[in-house]
């Protein structure tokens, strides 16, 4: 009677143990650990070394992937989960390989992917060098011609009409007004003077003339002078 009254009065709860099916998992069964020990001892005690095959790299990557999958599968044990909760979590765990393994397989499958930029060598580039510049030494580029505007040409023509030779002061003023350099003004006037002499058929002053020829033209030939004296 005392025992029955004690059981009735106390808040005793019957312990609930997990079903026997959960204990039959491979991680808890002694046969699983025994098989692992036998495999490890067989691998260490192998009298003959492994033969190196052509697929050694692929087998190594496959074993590394398998090892990473096993480590990810054993993570719930380290977190201290109840075996019953582990049984619910394991079916939902993904079986895909880690990203490192997938990257290795993609590299072996597609070594030349179209996403990589093509390599451009110097001899593949276009060389924008004209034929005239090829004669210059050290790759010196030819000076480009100055493109004068219509307003600039008109002002220069006016100045040339009044004065064919410019002073330094006037050249600076025109260059400042037309937004040109002094060298450009100087070259334009030189070219314009050459054109003007050619149009008027004037001799080029840069060519040295023979003084004896000039004297004969100015005074006439000596035979003509003798004839004139005889006639007188």
Swiss-Prot record:
Sequence-specific transcription factor which is part of a developmental regulatory system that provides cells with specific positional identities on the anterior-posterior axis. GO terms for cellular component: nucleoplasm. Its main location: nucleus. InterPro entries: Antp_homeobox_Deformed_sf (IPR050609), HD (IPR001356), HD_metazoa (IPR020479), Homeobox_antennapedia (IPR017995), Homeobox_Antennapedia_CS (IPR001827), Homeobox_CS (IPR017970), Homeodomain-like_sf (IPR009057). PANTHER family: HOMEOBOX PROTEIN HOX-B4, HOMEOTIC PROTEIN DEFORMED. Pfam families: Homeodomain. One of its GO terms (biological process) is anterior/posterior pattern specification. This is Homeobox protein Hox-B4. Residues 51-68, 94-104 have a biased composition (Low complexity). The gene is hoxb4. PROSITE patterns: ANTENNAPEDIA, HOMEOBOX_1, HOMEOBOX_2. It is found in: Nucleus. Signal peptide: none annotated. Keywords: Developmental protein, DNA-binding, Homeobox, Nucleus, Transcription, Transcription regulation. It comes from Xenopus laevis (African clawed frog). One of its GO terms (molecular function) is DNA-binding transcription factor activity, RNA polymerase II-specific. It comes from the Eukaryota. The keyword Flavoprotein does not apply. Belongs to the Antp homeobox family. Deformed subfamily. Transmembrane segments: none annotated.
């Amino acid at each position: 009677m005392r025992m029955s009254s004690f059981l009735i009065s106390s808040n005793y709860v019957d312990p609930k143990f997990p079903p026997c099916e959960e204990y039959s998992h491979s991680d808890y069964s002694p046969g699983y650990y025994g098989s692992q020990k036998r495999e490890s001892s067989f691998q260490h005690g192998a009298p003959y070394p492994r033969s190196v095959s052509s697929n050694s790299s692929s087998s190594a990557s496959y074993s590394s992937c398998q090892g990473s999958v096993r480590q990810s599968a054993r993570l719930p044990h380290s977190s201290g989960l109840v075996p019953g909760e582990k049984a619910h979590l394991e079916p939902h765990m993904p079986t895909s390989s880690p990203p490192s393994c997938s990257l290795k397989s993609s590299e072996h499958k597609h070594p030349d992917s179209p996403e990589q930029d093509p390599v451009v060598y110097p001899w593949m580039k276009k060389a924008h060098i004209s034929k005239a510049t090829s004669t210059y030494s050290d790759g010196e580029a030819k000076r480009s011609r100055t493109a004068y505007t219509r307003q600039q040409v008109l002002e220069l023509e006016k100045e040339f009409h009044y004065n064919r030779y410019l002073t330094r002061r006037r050249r600076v003023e025109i260059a400042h007004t037309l937004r040109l350099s002094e060298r450009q003004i100087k070259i334009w006037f030189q070219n314009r003077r050459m054109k003007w002499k050619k149009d008027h058929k004037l001799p080029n002053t840069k060519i040295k003339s023979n003084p004896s020829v000039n004297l004969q033209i100015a005074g006439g030939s000596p035979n003509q002078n003798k004839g004139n004296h005889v006639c007188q």
